[in-house]
Amino acid sequence: MDKINPDWAKDIPCRNITIYGYCKKEKEGCPFKHSDNTTATTINDVPPPIDVGEATTPTMTSVPKFNAKVSASFTPMTVGSDSLTTVTNTTSAATNATGNIAMAATSATASTVNPMINPIVNSSLVNNNNNNSNISISIPTTASSSNYDPFNAPIFTPSSTSSIHTNANAHSFPFPSIANSGGININATDDNSNNMSMANNVPPPMQPPPIESSNLKYPRIYPPPHSLLQYHLYAPEQPSSLKSLLKPNERSADQLFIPNNIREDLTKKNLSILQVFPSSGKVIPSIVQDYFNLVPLNFNNNDFLNKTTLFKVFSNYDGKAYVLKRLPNIDKSMNPNKISKIYQIWSKINCTNLIKFRDIFQTTKFGDLSICLVFDYYPNSLSLYDYHFVNFPKFPITNNYLWIYLVQLTNVINSIHSQNLSIGNTLNWRKVLITGDPGRIKLSHCNFMDLLFNDDTDTVVSSGGSTIEGQQQLDYKYLGELLFNLSINIENSNNNTAPKEYRLEEITPQSIDDMRQIDDKFKDVLKYLISDNGDSKKSIHDLTSHFYDKMFMVLESSQTYTEYMESVLSRELENGRLFRLVNKLNCIFGRIESRIDINWSESGTKFPIILFYDYVFHQVDSNGKPIMDLTHVLRCLNKLDAGIQEKLMLVTPDELNCIIISYKELKDLIESTFRSITQ
């Protein structure tokens, strides 16, 4: 190979720079050109004018290449006193030039492009009365870089000033103001620039109003808003006025999938379960005992660390989500045997209307000696008070709701009293949670505090003592107080009026008779619950004798809802079957090895699979426009999965050849092809 002439190659860019970003032969005598801008340019050196009407195309040599091997990690620029420079026109000839573009550099010498530096180009548009235009573009010098802390960064506040300025000291887009920086204020309003832009009929761009940074208090909860599940982007159901009448054997597309309300509810619950709270471990510990990823559920309290708090946690044993209730500042002299006895007693209770108690332990992870109680987690659950009086949209209280609540709470009392325990004053409308429809409720927790701080635990759980029997009799009164407060606020649940809460000593038989919103049978139940029977004691048997007929109504509604959910699951089961069939088709269709296999050619045995795939998923109308018919897809996949003897005609894209084949033959061909891949 002949030697390269250095005089001829010195003006030709090196190909290694273009391809790789660098040339390893540069220091060994590579004769080609390795740097583009080696000449010095001063501020007074004005390049030759460029005709605006003439189109210019940049060459490959003028475009810098990114070198990933020598580039450093991204470091944001900080605004300093030397970060911006003001460019002024030094000659009157440049200002009076018509249709010329002047490029001014801020440094004495122009260097090659460094990927570590991201210069901000600031442009100012000036139009004078003589219709002479001069577009001046300035590139600021490299600002001093510093370490960026995302947790201590100021909240972004958009600027309300115009982004078109004649002063080069202002950026063309807003920045958060930096106090005590010693540099210029890039959010300051330039009166001269605003007046000039208005004088030349340059309308300022529309920008959002300024937002006070002190009012932006968002909890840093993962996932961020941009990765939330977009359940609301599904197509809504058609209104009843637009739905066509279907025959008994016909189905619409909405009837083939899960209903929208159930899908959205389950999606929101899954999102609540999967949310985590990235904490530094200073305020909220990362791991407590066998639980991790603590997410506060009541972090709106002012005194967060000194109050009873609830956390959503994940277990190391099974990976499921639970609720951890922390009781702070516990006496160090507490007997550990008392804690173990509480767990042994309450963990035996299995009631569908009582949240299951899972674990109890002591910990010092919160900076003090705390007792933690672990329960099952029900996402997006609301208390009776929030469900009917606070949450939007409100669900009004009806007589059917009252009977449903009474039956379920009676079941809780029966389960707890059968274990020789009592509920206590936790039986109120802020401790009873709505976990689902129709009116399914669960009692959150019972009197653990009394058991923990009672000096004599044996008297609380004794079977023959008067203490436990007296507390069980109080449970009936607490139930009557809860139902009375719900009944008397039926009208308040339909409007925005605040609910009235009555104490037990304020409820009288006369106040029950004065209520017109409930029937007489429910009034008899309330009178029985709040009355003092003297020597005779209340019991579950006597209580249920007042509304045994209503228990059948609750049982019937529960059975109906169970059958409805089973029908929904059966439809999803069919959809899962079709999903597996689509996976099989995608596994065998379009593989690289099939391009050279003669069996996949037009004369091959597996060519009908290609035609069937196009027939199902690549539909076109008579004009060749792509269309999507979900009914056609489901019908073909169901016939293929059943393997019926019905035949169909598959046509090639050029419409020159066709194949007549049955769904059974197609199914056998797909199954054999899939087995040949997996084996």
Curated annotation (Swiss-Prot):
One of its GO terms (molecular function) is protein kinase activity. The keyword ATP-binding applies. Disulfide bonds: none annotated. One of its GO terms (cellular component) is P-body. The modification Phosphothreonine is found at residue 57. A motif (PABPC-interacting motif-2 (PAM-2)) lies at residues 143-163. ATP binds at residues 325, 376-383, 430-431. Keywords: ATP-binding, Coiled coil, Cytoplasm, Metal-binding, mRNA processing, Nucleotide-binding, Phosphoprotein, Zinc, Zinc-finger. One of its GO terms (biological process) is DNA repair. Phosphorylated by the cyclin-CDK complex PCL1-PHO85. It is found in: Cytoplasm. Residues 275-548 are annotated as: Pseudokinase domain. Changing residue 156 to A: Significantly decreases interaction with PAN1. Residues 588-679 are annotated as: Knob domain. Residues 549-587 form a coiled coil. The keyword RNA-binding does not apply. The modification Phosphoserine is found at residue 252. A zinc finger (C3H1-type) spans 8-37. It comes from the Eukaryota. Belongs to the protein kinase superfamily. PAN3 family. Present with 1600 molecules/cell in log phase SD medium. Regulatory subunit of the poly(A)-nuclease (PAN) deadenylation complex, one of two cytoplasmic mRNA deadenylases involved in mRNA turnover. PAN specifically shortens poly(A) tails of RNA and the activity is stimulated by poly(A)-binding protein PAB1. PAN deadenylation is followed by rapid degradation of the shortened mRNA tails by the CCR4-NOT complex. Deadenylated mRNAs are then degraded by two alternative mechanisms, namely exosome-mediated 3'-5' exonucleolytic degradation, or deadenylation-dependent mRNA decaping by DCP1-DCP2 and subsequent 5'-3' exonucleolytic degradation by XRN1. The N-terminal zinc finger binds to poly(A) RNA. Homodimer. Forms a heterotrimer with a catalytic subunit PAN2 to form the poly(A)-nuclease (PAN) deadenylation complex. Interacts (via PAM-2 motif) with poly(A)-binding protein PAB1 (via PABC domain), conferring substrate specificity of the enzyme complex. This is PAN2-PAN3 deadenylation complex subunit PAN3. It comes from Saccharomyces cerevisiae (strain ATCC 204508 / S288c) (Baker's yeast). The gene is PAN3.
